[in-house]
Amino acid sequence: MMKTNYENIAMLLQNGTSVKIYADNFSVSNIRLLAQTAVKHGAVLHLVVNPDYILADNLKLISQDGRKNIFVEFV
């Protein structure tokens, strides 16, 4: 199994591929950049989030980047 990293996800999004990631593996700033990349290239970024890990305010900022392109799932 390939280790998930920011560069791999960004490359997939730049190619218009929709991806589902576990937000715990990324910094908030990287998630924000991935969200912006998804919007720019018409891909969908599905974030699986542990509510104890990331603040709701950060999720609001991230989701403002593109409501149709960003999905947040709490686990």
Regions found by a protein language model. Name each.
Residues 1-75:
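General marker for long, soluble alpha-helical cores
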